[in-house]
Design a protein with these regions (language model features):
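Short loop immediately C-terminal to the Walker-B catalytic DE motif
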Residues: 1-2
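C-terminal lobe/lid and adjacent interdomain/linker elements of RecA-like ASCE P-loop ATPase modules
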Residues: 7-104
Length: 104
């Protein structure tokens, strides 16, 4: 998703969702417009000490999903408008998915 943003990123998210309806899709993105279409968000964390680097993976709940989308937009955890926009992105993606599924 390098070099895209805005409406183009939303279209990519819609297309990825269309593919994901019949196949498993694993996507790594820093675009909230694409991430909003995910059915499941996994958060990757790295922990390093002087000898090793460990990577952990955990599934985010709904509140964490919105917070993470706001974070990748560059907002702080206290930024209510970014949190609201992140929630709206997820809601919009869910409406799109519901509409597509109703067509079946």
């Amino acid at each position: 998703d390098t070099g895209i943003s805005g409406r183009t990123a939303v279209i990519v998210g819609e297309r990825l969702y269309s593919v994901a309806r019949s196949r498993q899709v694993l996507s790594i993105t820093h675009l909230p417009q694409i991430a909003a279409f995910a059915d499941c968000h996994l958060f990757v964390e790295k922990h390093s000490d002087s000898e090793k680097t460990k990577t952990s993976l955990r599934e985010l709940n709904n509140a964490e999903r919105s917070a993470e989308l706001a974070r990748i937009m560059g907002a702080s955890a206290a930024d209510e408008s970014a949190q609201k926009y992140a929630s709206e992105l997820i809601e919009s993606a869910n409406r799109f998915k519901l509409k597509v599924n109703e067509l079946d």
